[in-house]
Amino acid sequence: MKQLWAPWRMTYIENHENVDGCVFCNAQAKEDSADNLIAHRGERAYVILNRYPYTGGHLMVVPFEHKAILEELDAQTRGEMMELTSRCMIILRKLYKPQGFNMGANIGEAAGAGVKEHVHIHIVPRWKG
């Protein structure tokens, strides 16, 4: 597969700028429920399911602090984000049995960030074919 195309993401692509405030700050301010999609809250960051996933199991690790780039976060927050990312990959391997992962952050508009004002790490399980 040369391109990862998820047609169900068109709703996000066409409407993502209609959200009042920051989607990640809004999510973390709500109580945990199926509606806000938060799977885990740590001390400095949380794990949230992607509402418009590229694949099943697409998760994001998001700091509670509203910062646009990783280097604006303190070392403890960056460390917790990487620990949560690793734990997510362990769990996803057990549940989804992916053959690989795409993991990373799109920082800035030129890098393809959909929410460029609040840095976050994507964890996308992948399979061949």
Predicted regions and their residues:
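HIT superfamily nucleotide-processing domains
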Residues: 1-129
